[in-house]
Amino acid sequence: MSFVLAIDQGTTSSRAIVFRSDISIAAVAQQEFPQHFPASGWVEHEPEDIWTSTVMTCRDALDKAGIKAKDIAAIGITNQRETTVVWDRATGQAVHRAIVWQDRRTADICAKLKADGYEPDVSAKTGLIIDPYFSGTKVAWILDHVPGARERAERGELLFGTVDCYLLWRLTGGRVHATDATNASRTLLFNIHTGQWDDTLLKLLRVPRSMLPEVKDSSAEFGTTTPDLFGGPIKVSGIAGDQQAATIGQACFTPGMMKSTYGTGCFALLNTGATPVKSNNKLLTTIAYQLGGVRTYALEGSIFVAGSAVQWLRDGLGIIKHAAETGPLADKSDSMQSVYLVPAFVGLGAPYWNPRVRGALFGLTRNTGPAELAHATLESVCYQTYDLWAAMRADWPDASAATIVLRVDGGMTASDWTMQRLADLLDAPVDRPMIQETTALGAAYLAGLNAGVYPEPEKFADNWRLEHRFKPAMSAATRQRKLAGWARAVKGVLASDEGE
């Protein structure tokens, strides 16, 4: 039997999952690593922590599965997107900590670019908006703030990569500097229509072309690992950013299929097929995957705070000890209270895109307690998803509640309470799959497709299995009342921004 090893390098932990040829899971390993918050709105990782935790989990997963490197047909990599690493081409030493996708330090840079009128052209080429979320301004910040970095970059001494690219470079012993189209499409430097790095964008952000990796299909020959890492060489043949990998793992290969992943943040992608759809509602146009040189596009909405809001309940407020307690606690809340949490801890993502605002609670009374806060926290994720859902339906002419199929994954989907409330607020069914490791499965599929372990997308889609369908059960009047309250809460938060 052939096995495929998936590396799932996330925001708070690195994971490795061994899949069998029938897509069942043979072993899982996970290791958390430290987060660094050197200033308000700043989030960093040590690249060496990312690398070490990745290698350790891969070795652990192989041991748990009882297999050797020779049993692995291929490795697939999926990663936290946009997180930016710049390192020395000769030594592999990072010149600065990785700047994480959540980091907002470049808000002023982005504001100036917008004020100077660059956003329409940038958006037309990249499908993105000018925002600190994306890699381009993070690279520029590193080059401008690390002594000597810009000069070294101009001399061709430094390399840039998203996390997949950095891991691939390390896995191959510095022999391969490459990424895939999905990760490239998140940098603010890549033209999603031509499939090339864009010289105008590079000039705008003053990023030398020599720093950039080669861009390949999501399923391709990316090189082989050095034999010393895992006891023998293993080829790497699949790469995709985490949200695109989840889209593939959910078998959303048909236009109109939508997946929503609930981890630290929440990310929804709607497959729009071979044609990029320009959003009129501040959604992103991105590459869902690229196979055989053919790009498939998606509309994407990004929510910065989802699971991390539950972490706030646990670590910040101390009202729960474990995330699993949140749903049962929320179920005990006072139905007469209408408490809303707008979790803009690092600003608001789609469809508002405001990095300056911060979170707020609305509707507090003397009787508001832990149950109401838990209720508001879980509901905030559902409300934010509704905002994305509504924007996608408005942007895509073929969309309707009847035509969009929503498949969910990620840690928060284990909460039946949250998924039922999501179906209620969307007034649409929500499908939870049997295999929850959809992000890793997507990476494994891309690698296994190239290695001949897995079939073409249409046949792979036949293996998708439903675990539970949540059907809407809320009255229209209640739904509208709740959504109106959420809209007022968001309006209140946006009004607090001095820049508005």
From Swiss-Prot:
<feature type="binding site">
    <location>
        <position position="133"/>
    </location>
    <ligand>
        <name>glycerol</name>
    </ligand>
</feature>
<comment type="function">
    <text>Key enzyme in the regulation of glycerol uptake and metabolism. Catalyzes the phosphorylation of glycerol to yield sn-glycerol 3-phosphate.</text>
</comment>
<feature type="binding site">
    <location>
        <position position="11"/>
    </location>
    <ligand>
        <name>ATP</name>
    </ligand>
</feature>
<keyword id="KW-0319">Glycerol metabolism</keyword>
<comment type="similarity">
    <text>Belongs to the FGGY kinase family.</text>
</comment>
<feature type="binding site">
    <location>
        <position position="311"/>
    </location>
    <ligand>
        <name>ATP</name>
    </ligand>
</feature>
<dbReference type="GO" id="GO:0006072">
    <property type="term" value="P:glycerol-3-phosphate metabolic process"/>
</dbReference>
<feature type="binding site">
    <location>
        <position position="15"/>
    </location>
    <ligand>
        <name>ADP</name>
    </ligand>
</feature>
<keyword id="KW-0418">Kinase</keyword>
<feature type="binding site">
    <location>
        <position position="82"/>
    </location>
    <ligand>
        <name>glycerol</name>
    </ligand>
</feature>
<comment type="pathway">
    <text>Polyol metabolism; glycerol degradation via glycerol kinase pathway; sn-glycerol 3-phosphate from glycerol: step 1/1.</text>
</comment>
<feature type="binding site">
    <location>
        <position position="81"/>
    </location>
    <ligand>
        <name>glycerol</name>
    </ligand>
</feature>
<dbReference type="GO" id="GO:0004370">
    <property type="term" value="F:glycerol kinase activity"/>
</dbReference>
<feature type="binding site">
    <location>
        <position position="411"/>
    </location>
    <ligand>
        <name>ATP</name>
    </ligand>
</feature>
<keyword id="KW-0067">ATP-binding</keyword>
<dbReference type="Pfam" id="PF02782">
    <property type="entry name" value="FGGY_C"/>
</dbReference>
<keyword id="KW-0547">Nucleotide-binding</keyword>
<feature type="binding site">
    <location>
        <position position="82"/>
    </location>
    <ligand>
        <name>sn-glycerol 3-phosphate</name>
    </ligand>
</feature>
<feature type="binding site">
    <location>
        <position position="242"/>
    </location>
    <ligand>
        <name>sn-glycerol 3-phosphate</name>
    </ligand>
</feature>
<feature type="binding site">
    <location>
        <position position="411"/>
    </location>
    <ligand>
        <name>ADP</name>
    </ligand>
</feature>
<feature type="binding site">
    <location>
        <position position="11"/>
    </location>
    <ligand>
        <name>ADP</name>
    </ligand>
</feature>
<feature type="binding site">
    <location>
        <position position="307"/>
    </location>
    <ligand>
        <name>ATP</name>
    </ligand>
</feature>
<dbReference type="GO" id="GO:0006071">
    <property type="term" value="P:glycerol metabolic process"/>
</dbReference>
<dbReference type="InterPro" id="IPR018485">
    <property type="entry name" value="FGGY_C"/>
</dbReference>
<feature type="binding site">
    <location>
        <position position="13"/>
    </location>
    <ligand>
        <name>ATP</name>
    </ligand>
</feature>
<feature type="binding site">
    <location>
        <position position="264"/>
    </location>
    <ligand>
        <name>ATP</name>
    </ligand>
</feature>
<feature type="binding site">
    <location>
        <position position="81"/>
    </location>
    <ligand>
        <name>sn-glycerol 3-phosphate</name>
    </ligand>
</feature>
<protein>
    <recommendedName>
        <fullName>Glycerol kinase</fullName>
        <ecNumber>2.7.1.30</ecNumber>
    </recommendedName>
</protein>
<dbReference type="InterPro" id="IPR043129">
    <property type="entry name" value="ATPase_NBD"/>
</dbReference>
<dbReference type="GO" id="GO:0005829">
    <property type="term" value="C:cytosol"/>
</dbReference>
<feature type="binding site">
    <location>
        <position position="264"/>
    </location>
    <ligand>
        <name>ADP</name>
    </ligand>
</feature>
<feature type="binding site">
    <location>
        <position position="307"/>
    </location>
    <ligand>
        <name>ADP</name>
    </ligand>
</feature>
<keyword id="KW-0808">Transferase</keyword>
<dbReference type="InterPro" id="IPR000577">
    <property type="entry name" value="Carb_kinase_FGGY"/>
</dbReference>
<feature type="binding site">
    <location>
        <position position="243"/>
    </location>
    <ligand>
        <name>glycerol</name>
    </ligand>
</feature>
<dbReference type="InterPro" id="IPR018483">
    <property type="entry name" value="Carb_kinase_FGGY_CS"/>
</dbReference>
<dbReference type="InterPro" id="IPR005999">
    <property type="entry name" value="Glycerol_kin"/>
</dbReference>
<dbReference type="GO" id="GO:0005524">
    <property type="term" value="F:ATP binding"/>
</dbReference>
<dbReference type="GO" id="GO:0019563">
    <property type="term" value="P:glycerol catabolic process"/>
</dbReference>
<feature type="binding site">
    <location>
        <position position="242"/>
    </location>
    <ligand>
        <name>glycerol</name>
    </ligand>
</feature>
<dbReference type="InterPro" id="IPR018484">
    <property type="entry name" value="FGGY_N"/>
</dbReference>
<feature type="binding site">
    <location>
        <position position="12"/>
    </location>
    <ligand>
        <name>ATP</name>
    </ligand>
</feature>
